[in-house]
């Protein structure tokens, strides 16, 4: 049975792991790194770069290099958070026909799941290279506070990448799995997972219990902010650099796309350096130019300055912690361990804030970049039956309900309910002889439905005429283990029923997903074609070089016509190298090989002659120098003493 891999699809970086021989293995990518930047670049020759190669060229290709796309996944274009990102991102965020936030690259509109699928494809390939077999199934992690549309969109991304997503699992829960199975501490423990990543923040309170030899992970509560993460910290530094440069040089860099990309790189580097040193210097020569000539940027930033810039962002993570503790029905003093996940938790100020709130030192023995992927791989092994000693009880992060008379949100399933779960409630009509009802489904905590996230709607028709309040309509909410919602409505009188799987009132249709899957497959074929073309060019290049070298050494031994025919074949091959396809290059390589046959014969004959000459010389050296050797007589003369 093939392995189910675990993928942490992050805003900034992604990671892939697998359970191999009972141990979790974090798999290195083709570049030798254990994490891969979640960056996709679309080149002008049609090639798609993913990961470190995409990141390296971002400065020169900012409009077609997509990063932090996870912040857009499953979101509407008109949402406040998306509108804020439009001004910050160098690439173009556009409104899709269904109202979703999409991106536009080189004149083509792409859905965020399509872009995320490119990253997932690289993760899939990384795992396949390591395992030496095809991988078709995965567990993918999402922020615990992701709503239904965002979870559905992540699942779609997996499908587009050619993966069957066996389970969508919450990031903090995955980290708890990795932590819990690795530890020797016995007995029940309550832990907090504080997960501050590149684009999202989550906090979960989880109880780990040993039930008859089985490790049980029960999520007691979860909370968070899906638009708060390392990208926001970077932005604070960028804004500061821009304002300082404007004060000094009078030039506004915020409108210069190329400069902004360099600033982003520098800000991220400075942020990382300031976690281990007290001061860093940002040095960007030729950042811009005006009438007086080129301008250079040189700026020192201290750790204290960075902390002042981002203090409010760190403070924003504490309120969700407070709510999560309250919802879990525990006290801060009941917490046994605090686990830090996500690259941003390496920042000393973040660690101090967490320690201050929870009153204990966070654990340092969990790798914040790899724990989530490791947990996903463990869940994969549970689903494949490889491990049978783990039970995971996750929760739905937000309340789910329907809109009832007066626009009120009637909650069917409360937040932090353990999933999978099912709940039914009976409703009635609001008017006499009402022939149909519209069931509008919402997710969120507000009392008025319009203040929450609309997930979808459907009609139940054919209700027989009756006074208001008489028909009985049973509405059932069913959440599966992925946290994805299925809703049905049934008229108890007639038995008529209608149901939907919530796909958001937008999201990708089945046709769109299928088209994107085909696109992705075509892309894979195109990548293969480009790789073959590159190989053909390299081989042709090597042949031209070798033939030229031989021609210089042995050319005078050829007849003029033979030499001319080889030189013409070399020129033909060189002409086709840059523009030709593989078949054309192969044909010219064949022609050059045929033309240089005579040259090969001359080289071979010459080498044979040289070898014979060397053998002859060796034989001569082995003979005595003179055959006329004369034996000499000698006589011993004894002298008198």
From Swiss-Prot:
Protein name: Chaperone protein DnaK
Domain of life, per lineage: Bacteria
Function: Acts as a chaperone.
Species: Bordetella bronchiseptica (strain ATCC BAA-588 / NCTC 13252 / RB50)
HAMAP family referenced in this protein's UniProt entry, alphabetically: DnaK
Residues recorded with modification Phosphothreonine: 200
Record keywords, A-Z: ATP-binding, Chaperone, Nucleotide-binding, Phosphoprotein, Stress response
Matches recorded under InterPro entries: ATPase_NBD (IPR043129), Chaperone_DnaK (IPR012725), Heat_shock_70_CS (IPR018181), HSP70_C_sf (IPR029048), HSP70_peptide-bd_sf (IPR029047), Hsp_70_fam (IPR013126)
Induction pattern: By stress conditions e.g. heat shock.
Cystines in this chain: none
Biased composition (Low complexity): 608-619
Family according to the record: Belongs to the heat shock protein 70 family.
Chain ranges passing through the membrane: none
Record region (Disordered): 606-641
Any one GO molecular-function label of the UniProt entry: unfolded protein binding
PANTHER family for the chain: HEAT SHOCK PROTEIN 70KDA (PTHR19375)
Biased composition (Basic and acidic residues): 632-641
Pfam family, one: HSP70
Residue ranges the record marks as coiled coil: none
């Amino acid at each position: 049975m093939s392995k189910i891999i675990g993928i942490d699809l992050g805003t900034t970086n992604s990671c892939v792991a697998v359970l191999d021989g009972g141990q979790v293995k974090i798999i290195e990518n083709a570049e030798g790194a254990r994490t891969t930047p979640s960056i996709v670049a679309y080149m002008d020759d049609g090639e798609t770069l993913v990961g470190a190669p995409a990141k390296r060229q971002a400065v020169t290709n900012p409009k077609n290099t997509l990063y932090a796309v996870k912040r857009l996944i499953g979101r509407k274009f008109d949402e406040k958070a998306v509108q804020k990102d439009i001004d910050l991102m160098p690439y173009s965020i556009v409104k899709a026909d269904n109202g979703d936030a999409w991106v536009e690259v080189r004149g083509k509109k792409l859905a965020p799941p399509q872009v995320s699928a490119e990253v997932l494809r690289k993760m899939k390939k990384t795992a396949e290279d390591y395992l030496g077999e095809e991988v078709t199934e995965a567990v993918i992690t999402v922020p615990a506070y992701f709503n239904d549309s965002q979870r559905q969109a992540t699942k779609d991304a997996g499908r587009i990448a050619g993966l069957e997503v066996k389970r969508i699992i919450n990031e903090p829960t995955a980290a708890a799995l990795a932590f819990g199975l690795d530890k020797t501490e016995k007995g029940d423990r309550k832990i907090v997972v504080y997960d501050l990543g590149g684009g999202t923040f989550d906090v979960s309170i989880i109880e780990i219990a040993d039930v008859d030899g089985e490790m049980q992970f029960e999520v007691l509560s979860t909370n968070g902010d899906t638009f708060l993460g390392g990208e926001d910290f970077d932005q604070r530094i960028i804004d500061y650099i821009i304002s300082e440069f404007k004060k000094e040089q009078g030039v506004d860099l915020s409108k210069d796309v190329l400069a902004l990309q360099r600033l982003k790189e520098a800000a991220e580097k400075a942020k990382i350096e300031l976690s281990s040193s007290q001061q860093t210097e940002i040095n960007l020569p030729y950042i811009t130019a005006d009438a007086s000539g080129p301008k250079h940027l040189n700026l020192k930033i201290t750790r204290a300055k960075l902390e002042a810039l981002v203090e409010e962002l760190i403070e924003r993570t504490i309120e969700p912690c407070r709510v999560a503790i309250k919802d879990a029905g525990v006290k801060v003093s009941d917490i046994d361990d605090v686990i830090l996940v996500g690259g941003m938790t390496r920042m000393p100020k973040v660690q101090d804030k967490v320690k201050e709130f929870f009153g204990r030192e966070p654990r340092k023995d969990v790798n914040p970049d790899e724990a989530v992927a490791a947990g996903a791989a463990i869940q994969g092994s549970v689903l494949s039956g490889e491990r049978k000693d783990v039970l995971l009880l996750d929760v739905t992060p937000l309340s789910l309900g329907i809109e009832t008379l007066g626009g009120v949100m009637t909650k069917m399933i409360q937040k932090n309910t353990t999933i999978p779960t099912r709940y039914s409630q009976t409703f009635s009509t609001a008017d006499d002889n009402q022939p149909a009802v519209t069931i509008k489904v919402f997710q969120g905590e507000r009392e008025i439905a319009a203040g929450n996230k609309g997930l979808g709607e459907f009609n139940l028709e054919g209700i027989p005429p009756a006074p208001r309040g008489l028909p009985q309509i049973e509405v059932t909410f069913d959440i599966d283990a992925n946290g994805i919602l299925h809703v049905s409505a049934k008229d108890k009188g007639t038995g008529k029923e209608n149901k939907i799987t919530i796909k958001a009132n937008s999201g990708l249709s089945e046709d769109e997903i299928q088209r994107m899957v085909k696109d992705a497959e075509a892309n894979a074929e195109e990548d293969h074609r480009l790789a073959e073309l590159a190989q053909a060019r390299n081989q042709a290049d090597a042949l031209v070089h070798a033939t030229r070298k031989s021609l210089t050494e042995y050319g005078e031994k050829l007849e003029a016509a033979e030499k001319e025919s080889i030189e013409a074949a070399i020129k033909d091959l060189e002409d086709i190298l840059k523009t030709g396809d593989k078949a054309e290059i192969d044909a010219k390589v064949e022609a050059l090989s045929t033309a240089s046959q005579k040259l090969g014969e001359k080289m071979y004959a010459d080498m044979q002659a040289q070898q014979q000459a060397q053998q002859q010389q060796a034989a001569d050296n082995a003979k005595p120098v003179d055959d006329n050797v004369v034996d000499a007589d000698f006589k011993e003369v004894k002298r008198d003493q």
